[in-house]
């Protein structure tokens, strides 16, 4: 049996094809971008699952945000903290991350420089002052003065002292026994009641004036009657005009008649 084939035939010439590099250099094989393969995969995926799931809604186009160095967080920061807190807690790390980004060679036009590292702004004094309540000078004035060892007796402005019930009670007790105080007793009362000597002195002056006003009688100017044990000689010496009348009344009527006869 005779075998006839192309391999056995000696007249057969082996075809020679150029390598693939020559095809790519001569643009015989078109080069596709990566987007082309992505489109084919997406189209095939949608083709297989188009019946099961509806097409997703179109995504809105958001403007690209330019991130600065403040948005970078250090390795020690916990998740969820904002850029202000990261810069506040780790200022050294944030400063080390603030470096100019290298320019890419693909961009022909120079890209705008990133904004400078924003440091945490200090709190405004007006906001801190608005939170604190306003205290006026008249609110700082304490009406009940305390004991001052260096008190020299002079005050810039006199103010009405508001005495407490305990202070008034102790002063009334002292006034009941002593209407006039000595210097030593005044100092003791001032220290015990947390008052100054001047305040004790003024209170006793006012209390004495009130006592005199309350005990003043309407007939104080009328001469009072003499006591029962007084001698009549003192009264006669005090009033010479009335002594003659008393002597005449003391003589018996017979002597008066004798004197009248002698006068005739």
Curated annotation (Swiss-Prot):
GO terms for cellular component: chromatin; nucleoplasm. Residues 156-215 bind DNA. It holds the Pfam family Homeodomain. Residues 19-130, 214-264 are annotated as: Disordered. One of its GO terms (molecular function) is RNA polymerase II cis-regulatory region sequence-specific DNA binding. Keywords: Developmental protein, DNA-binding, Homeobox, Nucleus, Transcription, Transcription regulation. Gene3D superfamilies: Homeodomain-like. GO terms for biological process: anterior/posterior pattern specification; cartilage development; embryonic skeletal system morphogenesis; positive regulation of transcription by RNA polymerase II. Residues 233-254 have a biased composition (Polar residues). Residues 100-110 have a biased composition (Low complexity). Residues 32-51 have a biased composition (Basic and acidic residues). A motif (Antp-type hexapeptide) lies at residues 135-140. InterPro entries: Antp_homeobox_Deformed_sf, HD, HD_metazoa, Homeobox_antennapedia, Homeobox_Antennapedia_CS, Homeobox_CS, Homeodomain-like_sf. It is found in: Nucleus. Belongs to the Antp homeobox family. Deformed subfamily. Sequence-specific transcription factor which is part of a developmental regulatory system that provides cells with specific positional identities on the anterior-posterior axis. This is Homeobox protein Hox-C4. It comes from Homo sapiens.
């Amino acid at each position: 049996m005779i075998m006839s084939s192309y391999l056995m035939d000696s007249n057969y010439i082996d075809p020679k094809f150029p390598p693939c590099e020559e095809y790519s250099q001569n643009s015989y094989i078109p080069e596709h971008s990566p987007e082309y393969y992505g489109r084919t995969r997406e189209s095939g995926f949608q083709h297989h699952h188009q019946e099961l799931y509806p097409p997703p809604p179109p995504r809105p186009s958001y403007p690209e945000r330019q991130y600065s160095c403040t948005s970078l967080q250090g390795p020690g920061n916990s998740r969820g903290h904002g850029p202000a807190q990261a810069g506040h807690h780790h200022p050294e790390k944030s400063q080390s991350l603030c470096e100019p980004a290298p320019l890419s060679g693909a961009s022909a036009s120079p890209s705008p420089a990133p904004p400078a590292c924003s440091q945490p702004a200090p709190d405004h004094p007006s906001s801190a002052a608005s939170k604190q309540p306003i205290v006026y000078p008249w609110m700082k004035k304490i009406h009940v003065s305390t004991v001052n060892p260096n008190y020299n007796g002079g005050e810039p402005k006199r103010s009405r002292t508001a005495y407490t019930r305990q202070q008034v009670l102790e002063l009334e007790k002292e006034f009941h026994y002593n209407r006039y105080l000595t210097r030593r007793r005044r100092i003791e009362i001032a220290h015990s009641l947390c008052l100054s000597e001047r305040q004790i002195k003024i209170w006793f002056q006012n209390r004495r004036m009130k006592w005199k006003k309350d005990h003043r009688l309407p007939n104080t100017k009328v001469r009072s009657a003499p006591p029962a044990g007084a001698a009549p000689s003192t009264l006669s010496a005090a009033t010479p005009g009335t002594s003659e009348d008393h002597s005449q009344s003391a003589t018996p009527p017979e002597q008066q008649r004798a004197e009248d006869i002698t006068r005739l």
